[in-house]
Every structure is written in C-alpha cells, then in structure tokens.
Design a protein with these regions (language model features):
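Short acidic/glycine-rich loops and adjacent helix/strand connectors
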Residues: 1-229
Length: 229
C-alpha cells in the first residue's frame, strides 16, 4: 500500500489531536484524550499512530502550536530531530532520508507556530460559509514572539487579540494585532512587519503592552470561581 495525497495535521498543546486529510477531505479527526483517557491531554502521539490505519505514507506533516518545534518540542536522542518529526520518520509516514539529521528541518514537516491566530481565523472562516469576512480572535496566548523592551532586554510577547481580513479561497491577511507580555514593556502603537511562513512578510497595525489581554482576565476570574476541570 502506497497512498499519496495525504496531509496529517496535528495540534501539539492542550487538547492535542490529529486530523488526516486526503485530497482536501477529512479522513479522520481525533483528540489525544480519546486514547489516553486524560482530559485535555497534550502531545498527539497515539493520534499520529492512528494514521497507520488509513495509510502508510503522508505527503506532509503540518504542526500547529504557539512555539516552534526546534526549540520546544523535545528532541529524539542522537538524531536530534524534534519528537513529532521523529515519530513520523520512525513510522515511515515521511521519508527517513528527508534530512541530514542532527536537528535539521525535514522538508515534509511544516511548522506553523508563528501564525497561531491566523490558524484560528482560518478555522472560523472556512466553517462560516462566507466568501468574505472579518475574523476577530481573542486568545489566552497565541504565538510567542521575541521582543526587546526599552532597555534592550529580551522579553517574550504573546498574541492576545488579532483581527484578520478573510477572502475565499486562501487570502487571510492580518489587519491588527495586540501583543501582551508579563515583563515590563513600554507601550508601543504603530505599524510592524512580521514573516508568514506561507505568504512571506506581512505589514499590519499593532499595539504592544504589559497586559494579559481579555481572555486571560476571563480565565483568572473563572479559575478564582472554581470553574476548572
């Protein structure tokens, strides 16, 4: 069996899961907690193995998260590839010869961690039925961005609110982004340029603050009231 036209998309963080597509149609979609029986479980390892029930080869592994694979996903001993690339390689879903090893990026693996809010916008837009729309995303912490404060110290910023212009079939552009940080940060308001791994550089309006954003405020209140798992 050597099927082609398959894309395996995985989400790494809480509520981790996998979705297998064949020529743009969903073959299966499942969260890791269905295998592990642990609510909201991360690391969709069992979900990736489930792919073998449908195909022994995929054309691409697409990874969604808020932080990049190379720095945060853990490493396979000796070869140095991240654990998700390593699992796909060892299961022979992707080519075992795709990299020179020792941490190199596999050409069949696509890390979309730098556009986390845009992925949320895409999910909303493609399920909406609209040909054109504006998507507003409010999130606890989207993509992690390295920033420098007024003292030129390195701090981490997080996407907290974003606005996107969406047009079918595949034009989703950033209009506005609010980035927050837990560190001391001078308020910034104005244009900024960031790279999209799919479409290249993007220019949009942004504000950077030392505030957590709407969603984290809501989360703090619900946690205080005991509305947790």
């Amino acid at each position: 069996m050597n099927k082609t036209g398959y894309i395996l998309a995985i989400a790494r963080g809480h509520n981790a899961g996998a979705c297998l597509l064949k020529d743009g149609k969903i073959v299966f979609s499942i969260e890791e907690e269905r295998f592990s029986r642990r609510k909201y479980d991360g690391g969709p390892y069992a979900a990736m193995i489930k792919t073998l029930d449908y195909t022994d080869k995929i054309d691409a592994l697409v990874v969604a998260h808020t932080q990049n694979l190379q720095d945060t996903a853990g490493k396979v001993d000796y070869s140095g590839d991240d654990v998700y690339t390593g699992i796909a390689r060892k299961l022979k879903l992707i080519s075992p010869y795709g990299t020179s090893g020792f941490g190199a990026q596999h050409p069949q693996v696509h890390d979309l961690s730098s556009i986390h809010h845009k992925l949320h916008a895409s999910c909303a837009f493609y399920r909406s039925g609209f040909d054109r729309a504006v998507a507003v995303i409010a999130d606890g912490a989207g993509t992690f961005f390295p920033l420098n404060n007024e003292r030129q110290e390195s701090v981490i910023g997080y996407e907290v609110e974003s606005v996107f212009s969406c047009e079918y079939p595949a034009n989703i552009s950033t209009i506005y982004k609010h980035m927050g940080t837990r560190d001391i940060m001078q308020f910034y308001e104005g244009p900024i340029s960031m790279d999209d791994p799919l479409t290249g550089p993007e220019n949009f309006y942004t504000i950077i603050t030392d505030r957590a954003g709407i969603t984290k405020t809501y989360e703090a209140v619900t946690n205080y009231c005991g509305f947790t798992e």
